[in-house]
Regions:
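Core beta-strand-centered patch of the WYL/Sm-like small regulatory domain
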Residues: 1-97
């Protein structure tokens, strides 16, 4: 799974997966370690979420991601992070350029 996420970030490709029972379509931006757990920070652009707010920034625990696929859809560039709530990482492994 890690290799798929890294490839999607490097190629700026949109990914889809199931998380907490919801279908997500996400622009992956950061793969890293937060509180000792591998996580993905992405901008969810389609799908659904328990919060109901889309599009929105979301952190995902890698261990809870299911049915991960790289889509044949590119995203143009790194989006601006609207707040500092996603800024803490123990280690950032890869950031979209």
């Amino acid at each position: 799974m890690k290799n798929i996420i890294i490839a999607a970030i490097k190629e700026k490709k949109v990914i889809s997966f199931t998380y907490s029972g919801f279908s997500r379509v996400v622009e992956p931006h950061i793969y890293g370690i937060n509180d000792g757990l591998p996580q993905l920070l992405g901008h969810q652009i389609r799908g659904s979420s328990s919060s109901g707010v889309i599009p929105e920034w979301r952190r995902f625990n890698i261990s809870a991601i299911q049915n991960l696929q790289i889509l044949n859809e590119l995203f143009p560039d790194r989006r601006s992070f609207s707040s500092g709530k996603h800024s803490h990482w123990d280690k950032q492994i890869l950031i979209v350029e």
